[in-house]
Amino acid sequence: METFYTCRNDRAFKEVFLNPNNSDLLKALLEFILKIKIDKLEIKKTELLSGNVNIKDKRVDAIVHTGNKKIEIEINSQNKDYLHTRSTAYICNIYQSNASVWDTYNEDTDIIQVNLTWGLGRNNDEMKIYKIMNEKGELYVKNFIIYEINMDYYDKIWYSKNEEEIKKNQYMIMLDLDKKELKNMPKDKIVDKYITNVTIVNNDPEFQKYMSEEEDKKKIQNSLLSEAKEEGISQGISQGYTSGI
């Protein structure tokens, strides 16, 4: 049986939400997270500085343009120590690229990063907002904003079986539900369309092939790292004996 990839997976998320035909799904999700009304959005390639393309392992993602905002979305399936450093590097690159477009430096365009992160803990806050400011809370710039969304918080709501809360938070909850769980979700046109599209993506042989190859690469990489670590430990022990330690 083929694996059903939820939108906790970066590739699956992009296939569903960055599809131009699914702009209504992306709009509904961002409106819920940012608590704003979006009249129109446009998905554009990231304007990365040429010298920093490797920052994304040579993959250029998309940025959502809406009104005076440029929004980047990061899918973090696990919470790792390096995440904040990496995410900061991404948004700083976008911030610098945006500043390079204009003849003058200004703060007219909000540069926003939305991190959908699993592994932060179900009992922690649902969201944290980060800005650049001093110890008095005075902003250094007003248009640099990072949202860190605790996706475990929404998993907790799902397993609570509180129908009212599930309905209220359904656009977040649906992102990591498997095929069987999605059938039990309260439905509206957004949820219905999401279910249809994430199913179509998972039924695509090319997508499944890509995901299988990616998982195989990760397994090989993890195996090589494990072997290197074991070899390093063995060498260290051997050198210790040789040195009389």
Predicted regions and their residues:
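An acidic, glycine-/histidine-flanked metal-binding catalytic module
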Residues: 142, 147-192, 197
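Generic structural signal for hydrophobic core residues of well-folded globular domains
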Residues: 16, 20, 33, 117, ...
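Short intrinsically disordered coil segments
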Residues: 126-134, 162-169, 213-215
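Accessory alpha/beta interaction modules
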Residues: 1-147, 155
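Generic alpha-helical propensity signal that fires on short helical segments
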Residues: 31, 59-61, 80-82, 88-93, ...
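Short, charged alpha-helical interaction segments and adjacent helix-coil junctions
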Residues: 1-3, 66-76, 173-245
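Generic detector of well-ordered alpha-helical segments enriched in charged/polar residues
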Residues: 10, 14-17, 26-27, 31, ...
